[in-house]
């Protein structure tokens, strides 16, 4: 297994950007892979491109527009507004069915062609937004499936799986990239960079985590 190279699933948001710089500290060669699935806010891809260009990281954008046709939701359709809070039953309407399944599967194909075994993704079960494909059991299951499907030894690493948003901010701080993550990323479901709209679930989670992180720094 090649332990010197890694591919990061990279959206340009807080979590994947933190993982990207975490990977840069650990591996000699890091490649970022983003997906164009006709998401509502193309600024997400612009942030990903800008970060990779600015910090000299090899970056690839793969076309996955089919996902928009298969799974209409509030992140891909202008006529569907984002839920402001989690529903009592089911998943939020910002959940894109099959997104992480497809992202990781396509990245695995890409990784094998490059002779890379390690795939890094920023999913988290501790502070997740009710998305089933952010759970540890899913990642472990998919890792086994991909290994069997391609007769190849992949290792899917999830640095954020068991930490909350405050701890994710602390990781960025410890890596020396807090300002990059705070100012240059896009997490907002309404497509607003940095601190975002402040109203969508992603912004509320990000803001709450930062507030808790600041409290930690002051202690």
From Swiss-Prot:
Cofactor remark: Binds 1 zinc ion per subunit.
CDD domains attached to this UniProt entry: QueC-like (cd01995)
EC number: 6.3.4.20
Recorded superkingdom: Bacteria
GO MF annotation, one: ligase activity, forming carbon-nitrogen bonds
Top EC class of this enzyme: ligase
Ligase found in the keyword field: yes
Cofactor(s), by name: Zn(2+)
Pathway(s) where this gene product acts: Purine metabolism; 7-cyano-7-deazaguanine biosynthesis
Short name of any one Pfam family annotated for the protein: QueC
Residues where ATP binds: 10-20
The keyword Aminoacyl-tRNA synthetase appears for this protein: no
Segments passing through the bilayer: none
Matches recorded under NCBIfam families: 7-cyano-7-deazaguanine synthase QueC
Family: Belongs to the QueC family.
Quaternary structure note: Homodimer.
Described function: Catalyzes the ATP-dependent conversion of 7-carboxy-7-deazaguanine (CDG) to 7-cyano-7-deazaguanine (preQ(0)).
The protein's name: 7-cyano-7-deazaguanine synthase
Organism: Clostridium botulinum (strain Kyoto / Type A2)
Classification lineage: Bacteria, Bacillati, Bacillota, Clostridia, Eubacteriales
